[in-house]
Amino acid sequence: MRILAKWLALAVLLCTTPAKAALDIVITEGVDAARPIAVMPFVWQGSGAAPQAIADVVMSDLVRSGTFKPLDELGLPQRNIGTAAQFQANSWSSVGAEALVLGTVKPYGTDQYLVSFDLIDLVKAQNQALKGPVSATEFLMDSRQTVISAAQFRQYGHRISDIVYEKLTGIRGAFLTRISYVVVNHTQKAPYQLMVADYDGVNEQMLLRSPEPLMSPTWSPDGRRLAYVSFENKKAEIFVQDLYTQVRTKVSSFPGINGAPAFSPDGKSLAITLSKDGQPEIYIIDIATKAIKRITNHYAIDTEPSWYPDGKSLIFTSERGGRPQIYRVELSSGKVSRETFEGEWNLGGSITPDGRSMIFVNRTNGKFNIARMDLSTRFMQVLTSTRLDESPSVAPNGTMVIYGTTYQGKQVLAAVSTDGRFKARLPAGQGEVKSPSWSPFL
């Protein structure tokens, strides 16, 4: 119980302070090594000022992906162009970018706008231009038109970013996803807040405010529900809340620990930690029927379950080897195997969506950092150099990890690419933020 007590004490301690309307994103490393891309301001074809700048959203998304570095608009060879027909390949020979995003916006009825965008392969366009005149179809990677409302500009900007990212990398973009996290404001009577925001911290919404700690939010596979732990009734209980109807369902309220919920891949069950039978063990509970099945049975602490993408196995943190390490249990046979061996502690693991890697917290020489292990080669890479890292959550496309850390004595969120090259902080303006969870594709 000694290690679990420390974990629980740390979780309660870190669940304490406030947040502002949105999280900032401060990029700290990795932009210089990113792939150059050109994003032109979308040409406004109406009167007065344009409603919103879609290109700004696209540029910010591509920078935050850690993969691309948009070039300074002032250094681009053409200005005020919005279609591939206006593109002059010869003018771009010295730019050095691999692609160009450009588009137009024009009024299309009451509170409606027609947004058009083109994605141009600059490398191919320049190569073709050396051979003579070329048509736009030879270097156009994508071209789309969509009618949106004034309220949808930012959302559609994320959609364009998703398209661009997938066309250039072959990996689905995750710019239309959301994150959940916990903040606390000790100046209020009900200081603990469960929050949801767009992946970039914009459109922050408070789902729940409580006078007692809230922790461990996690998303359902369809993105409609959050499971979390609440102490609002003076004890640990697990709830599932529908984000659209706001209906809350109490799933687990056994004596002792009710913690660390994780949705099964089909969304019908939760893997949880319960101590109702003595030591903390891993259980699976059916959300609808509340039927439970015990998965582990050991005198040591078993906690922090997480599912393999195929739903056939769980990984979990256990002290059964003397120190916290990550183990795997096959649900059909109950066979348990140890997964981590490097470092002093390894805990809080989750499997990447492709099933090839595991992301977790590694302690080496007393330092807690986020690490990734290739499940086939067992090669481990420490991804971060921040302090007291915890609660890693992987983006649904497997390219980024959001996690909790400490910066200038405060709890903040941070992000790191799964190759360790790109790093950013997401500090709140008023207080501390922790327990992040990245949504599935929405």
From Swiss-Prot:
Quaternary structure note: The Tol-Pal system is composed of five core proteins: the inner membrane proteins TolA, TolQ and TolR, the periplasmic protein TolB and the outer membrane protein Pal. They form a network linking the inner and outer membranes and the peptidoglycan layer.
The protein's UniProt keywords, in alphabetical order, are: Cell cycle, Cell division, Periplasm, Signal
Provide the protein's localization.
Periplasm
Protein name per UniProt: Tol-Pal system protein TolB
An example GO BP is: cell division
Q: What is its main location?
A: periplasm
- What's the domain of life for this entry? Bacteria
Q: Which family does it belong to?
A: Belongs to the TolB family.
Q: Which organism is it from?
A: Shewanella baltica (strain OS155 / ATCC BAA-1091)
What InterPro entries is this protein classified in?
A: 6-blade_b-propeller_TolB-like, PD40, Tol-Pal_TolB, TolB_N
Q: Which residues form the signal peptide?
A: 1-21
Q: What does this protein do?
A: Part of the Tol-Pal system, which plays a role in outer membrane invagination during cell division and is important for maintaining outer membrane integrity.
Q: Does the keyword Nucleotidyltransferase apply?
A: no
On whether Transmembrane helix is a keyword of this UniProt record, the answer is no
Could you state one GO cellular component term attached to this entry?
Answer: periplasmic space
